[in-house]
A protein has these predicted regions:
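An N-terminal assembly and electron-transfer interface module characteristic of large anaerobic redox
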Residues: 1-315
Length: 315
């Protein structure tokens, strides 16, 4: 829903899966005065035209700063579009000013409230994986790795948005439980629990491969990542060596129910630099781009990729 231009960043940089495959993201392409004067009929006409040209199961109107500033009524846009096309329309009232995971949180809720309506018979062997995006897990093979881990337990992983599509969302009520792998998906898991009674747990099934074999005994360790991944790494370290002292930090969404008292939120680079300078850490787990920020750190730095931080994936 941007006035024109911002979509290039999304398609060209923010979604690494589109480096190798087609996407179906369109800019509203409106002139300044169209946006300011609220000529919504032109946006509706463009959406209907795009829907006629591609094979789509639904359309989503996603907000950016300009429509946020002029007070765009997304629900009205949704109703106008649904009258002109047979496609279901989602409206996600993002404003382009929050961090990426806030938009993810709204998108998950919009998807499940719109499409997960029918109650199916529960299959205990199926496990829903919520929060699986390249921005959060930083590995395009992560879904396959999680599937392999759960297969060892006789379970089938349903990775919403990373291999499993709209049909899986529609049948979300049939999974025996959900596993939340990013904080952005927590509200979606709560919605599914409230609506269908589906229990959820928080963690990352493939966390073991993120923790190298090091001497963790008595070590003070800092883990910087999105909150659930950081917590999963902490639990994996403590499982191997419970004498370690592990603190987590994140640049992004931080849910109180997932945090320990010593965990911190980071806003500026100086926050991270000061934390490392004064923390006395022996080992740091963080994206490699953050190693240069602390040149005086004398301990072990473990490269733990976070695509949302560096724009780089696990190799």
């Amino acid at each position: 829903c941007d006035a024109g231009g911002c979509t290039g960043n999304v398609c060209g940089f923010d979604e690494p899966r589109w480096f190798e495959r087609k996407s179906a993201v369109f800019s509203a392409g409106l002139r300044d005065m169209d946006a300011i004067l609220g000529r919504d009929d032109r946006l509706v006409a463009k959406l209907v035209d795009a829907a006629d040209k591609i094979d789509a199961n639904f359309a989503a109107i996603v907000g950016t700063p300009v429509p946020a500033v002029i007070g765009t009524d997304y629900q009205a846009l949704k109703r106008m579009c649904e009258k002109k096309t047979d496609l279901p329309i989602l409206a996600v009232d993002t404003d382009g000013m929050e961090l990426y995971d806030k938009g993810e949180e709204k998108a998950y809720l919009a998807l499940f409230t719109a499409f997960a309506k029918e109650k199916y018979e529960v299959c205990k062997e199926k496990v829903g994986i919520l929060g699986m995006t390249p921005q959060d897990v930083s590995d395009l093979k992560a879904a396959d790795k999680v599937r392999e881990e759960l297969k060892k337990e006789g379970k089938e992983a349903i990775c919403y948005g990373m291999g499993d599509g709209l049909e899986a969302v529609e049948r979300a009520s049939e999974v025996g439980k959900n596993i939340v792998v990013s904080a952005a998906a927590l509200e979606g898991a709560k919605y599914l629990e409230k609506t269908f009674g589906t229990p959820y747990e928080i963690g990352y099934p493939a966390a073991g491969e993120l923790v190298p074999n090091l001497d963790y005994q008595g070590k003070k360790i800092l883990v910087v990542h999105q909150q659930v991944m950081a917590e999963a790494i902490r639990q994996e370290i403590l499982k191997r060596e419970n004498s370690a002292e592990v603190q987590t930090a994140t640049w992004f969404m931080r849910k109180k129910e997932l945090a320990c008292p010593q965990d911190v939120s980071l806003r500026e680079e100086d926050d991270y630099i000061d934390l490392v300078k004064n923390g006395g850490f022996d080992i740091i787990f963080a994206d490699a781009c953050m190693e240069k920020m602390v040149p005086d750190f004398q301990g072990i730095f473990v490269n733990t990729r976070h695509f949302a931080v560096s724009g780089r994936l696990c190799e």
